[in-house]
C-alpha cells in the first residue's frame, strides 16, 4: 500500500502537531504554517469544515493511514454501538504496526510498518506481514524467532532499551522474549493526544 513520503516538517507545521519525532523538533523550532504567508495563515479563522478536515488529517498522518483505509476504519467504527470516535481511535491503536511501535520494537510507526512488511513480526506464532491487521485481546505479538539474531533486535535486548520502555497498560511487554500480549482494549487516553475525534465524526457525517 502507498504511504506518504513527503516532508514531515511541512505537514507538522501545517497541522500544528508533530506527526513524527522529527516533525515535532521542526515544529518546536518554527510553529508557523509553511509558505510565504505562514504567520497570517495561523491567525486566519478556520471554517467548521476546515477544522474537521484538519483533525482527520492529523489522525491520518500520525498513524500513517491513507484516505481509503481511514474511511474504511471510520465506517467500521460507525457500525458499532457506542461512541464512534473513540472506537475509531481504538481501531487505529490496534493496528499491528502501531502495536509494534507501542511495544518499543520500533522508534517510529514508519519503522514498525517496515518490520511488519519484511516479515519480522508474528501474531500468535504466525508470521503476519500486514501492517493494518487489527490485533485482538489475548493475542501475542512477537519478533519472529528467526529474526531475533539480527543485530537490530539483539541490540534492543542487550542495550536494555526495552527494559526501560513503558508500554501502555493495554499491552504487556516481555522485553527478554521480544513479545507483548494484548491484555485489554485501548482506552481513549491511550490514543495519540491532540486529536479531537468528534470533529472527524462530523467530517464524515456531513
UniProtKB/Swiss-Prot annotation:
SUPFAM superfamilies: Alpha-L RNA-binding motif (SSF55174). The keyword Iron does not apply. Gene3D superfamilies: Ribosomal Protein S4 Delta 41, Chain A, domain 1 (1.10.1050.10), RNA-binding S4 domain (3.10.290.10). GO terms for molecular function: rRNA binding; structural constituent of ribosome. GO terms for cellular component: small ribosomal subunit. Signal peptide: none annotated. Keywords: Ribonucleoprotein, Ribosomal protein, RNA-binding, rRNA-binding. SMART domains: Ribosomal_S4, S4. Pfam families: Ribosomal_S4, S4. GO terms for biological process: ribosomal small subunit biogenesis; translation. Residues 94-157 form the S4 RNA-binding domain. InterPro entries: Ribosomal_uS4, Ribosomal_uS4_bac-type, Ribosomal_uS4_CS, Ribosomal_uS4_N, S4_RNA-bd, S4_RNA-bd_sf. Belongs to the universal ribosomal protein uS4 family. Part of the 30S ribosomal subunit. Contacts protein S5. The interaction surface between S4 and S5 is involved in control of translational fidelity. This is Small ribosomal subunit protein uS4. It comes from Chloroflexus aurantiacus (strain ATCC 29366 / DSM 635 / J-10-fl).
Amino acid at each position: 500500500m502507498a504511504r506518504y513520503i513527503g516532508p514531515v516538517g511541512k505537514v507538522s507545521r501545517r497541522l500544528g502537531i508533530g506527526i513524527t519525532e522529527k516533525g515535532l523538533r521542526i515544529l518546536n523550532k518554527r510553529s508557523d504554517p509553511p509558505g510565504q504567508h505562514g504567520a497570517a495563515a495561523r491567525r486566519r479563522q478556520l471554517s467548521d469544515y476546515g477544522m474537521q478536515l484538519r483533525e482527520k488529517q492529523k489522525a491520518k498522518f500520525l498513524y500513517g493511514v491513507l484516505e481509503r483505509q481511514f474511511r474504511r476504519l471510520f465506517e467500521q467504527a460507525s457500525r458499532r454501538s457506542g461512541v464512534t470516535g473513540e472506537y475509531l481511535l481504538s481501531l487505529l491503536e490496534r493496528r499491528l504496526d502501531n502495536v509494534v511501535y507501542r511495544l518499543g520494537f520500533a522508534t517510529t510507526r514508519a519503522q514498525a510498518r517496515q518490520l511488519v512488511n519484511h516479515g519480522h513480526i508474528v501474531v500468535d506464532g504466525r508470521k503476519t506481514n500486514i501492517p493494518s491487521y487489527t490485533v485482538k485481546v489475548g493475542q501475542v505479538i512477537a519478533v519472529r524467532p528467526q529474526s531475533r539474531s539480527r543485530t537490530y533486535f539483539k541490540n534492543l535486548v542487550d542495550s536494555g532499551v526495552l527494559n526501560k520502555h513503558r508500554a501502555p497498560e493495554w499491552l504487556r511487554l516481555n522485553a527478554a522474549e521480544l513479545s507483548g500480549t494484548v491484555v485489554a482494549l485501548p482506552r481513549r487516553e491511550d490514543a495519540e493526544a491532540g486529536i479531537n475525534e468528534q470533529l472527524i465524526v462530523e467530517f464524515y457525517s456531513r
